[in-house]
Swiss-Prot record:
Signal listed as a keyword: yes
Encoding gene per record: mdoG
One GO term describing the cellular component: outer membrane-bounded periplasmic space
Subcellular location: Periplasm
Residues forming coiled coils: none
InterPro entries linked to this entry: Gal_mutarotase_sf_dom (IPR011013), GH-type_carb-bd (IPR014718), Glucan_biosyn_MdoG/MdoD (IPR014438), Glucan_biosyn_MdoG_C (IPR007444), Ig-like_fold (IPR013783), Ig_E-set (IPR014756), MdoG_OpgG (IPR023704)
Keyword rRNA processing part of the UniProt annotation: no
GO molecular function, one term: catalytic activity
Protein name as it appears in the record: Glucans biosynthesis protein G
Cited function: Involved in the biosynthesis of osmoregulated periplasmic glucans (OPGs).
Keyword tags: Periplasm, Signal
Membership in a protein family: Belongs to the OpgD/OpgG family.
Major location category of this protein: periplasm
Source organism per UniProt: Salmonella paratyphi A (strain AKU_12601)
HAMAP family (alphabetical): MdoG_OpgG (MF_01069)
Amino acid sequence: MMKMRWLGAAIMLTLYASSSWAFSIDDVAKQAQSLAGKGYEAPKSNLPSVFRDMKYADYQQIQFNSDKAYWNNLKTPFKLEFYHQGMYFDTLVKINEVTATTVKRIKYSPDYFNFGNVQHDKDTVKDLGFAGFKVLYPINSKDKNDEIVSMLGASYFRVIGAGQVYGLSARGLAIDTALPSGEEFPRFREFWIERPKPTDKRLTVYALLDSPRATGAYRFVIIPGRDTVVDVQSKVYLRDKVGKLGVAPLTSMFLFGPNQPSPTTNYRPELHDSNGLSIHAGNGEWIWRPLNNPKHLAVSSYAMENPQGFGLLQRGREFSRFEDLDDRYDLRPSAWITPKGDWGKGKVELVEIPTNDETNDNIVAYWTPDQLPEPGKEMNFKYTLTFSRDEDKLHAPDNAWVLQTRRSTGDVKQSNLIRQPDGTIAFVVDFVGADMKKLPPDTPVAAQTSIGDNGEIVDSNVRYNPVTKGWRLMLRVKVKDAKKTTEMRAALVNADQTLSETWSYQLPANE
């Protein structure tokens, strides 16, 4: 009997020992906090010049051998592939696998890669490393693994859901964006990826962030689906004071659209990864800010307490809006951030940077807190990131939203029925929504409008749009000084009931 008791105790002890070990964000946070207390050491590149100086076309030739995907021989729906170092991805990133009992470094091997026509000395690459990784999952078809996550460059990552193609990017952290001192780009220097079980439908990734003035520990839980959701937890530590901290940053591209048409003839009516910033403020207000490609750097701030959500969206999915068979902007996802817990007082900030082509990301959006702790103190941020093509789902059904913003030369119809330009700028704003569609066409919908000191609203009228079953606002505004920006706001109401989100537009200077 005593022998059986000892045997039972031994089994219980074994179970306890095996279940008590678990890798967590706290393990990464210890490293981040330790780094924050030390001086910053810039990463050193170990790349041969043939890789460091290569052009993008050459870098694209270095392809991962898909038959050597990590976890290929395991019964798990997730697979990993890796990015080779090259071009400006010139420093190695450590990548580890976390199992139920241990942490193991995933070792680099040139055998993972096909180098194409890139001429190189095989001896010089044998001790290199990875620049990042991608996650594959059968998201569109059960018998085909598609790339759903890409972690490459600084703290950038891209995510897609079913039927989507890569568009905008998310980042771990942004520092001093759009400040005269220049932006600092933190980087993920090491990753830990949990080996998923055969039945797992989610993948957990940990990351250690480092930069001259900040460190951080991150936990990403990736849940693929029609909308792919990433659950994010971060613990951030400042090494030194920063001018501005950008939390949950998103990076996108806007070249032109109907609110700011292409200056040259283009068969594509619109060209952008996102066309607006959507905000659900702490007080419940919904705000829509159409994006611009300004001639000068522009920063817009929306002060609030405890934001309920914000994101860069791609509203309007018809192929006819883009007409691009190669880059399929109509399939690029919107990204929506839902904070968890109270984020306190701060601002959702939008940065718009001039660009001449679509290869440059020129749009940044993030949350920046009003108060930052002293260096070394921990900051915690939790939020979900949803990548979706279903923009209706990212908005309250009882609140109509802006379907499109179109800009035109303002004019007045003469007695001879010919339209004559009158020196104004016209805006056509279409509002739609689930509840709005139920309103009778003769509902007395009106607009509440306002404009900043640099402009004057010459005319404002609202009419029912039978095509969209929504309402169309038509504005004519006169700008006083074209060298300055002009701010406008509008929302639809029915008596004392607000029917729509707030259209918040900035007409760029020198337009």
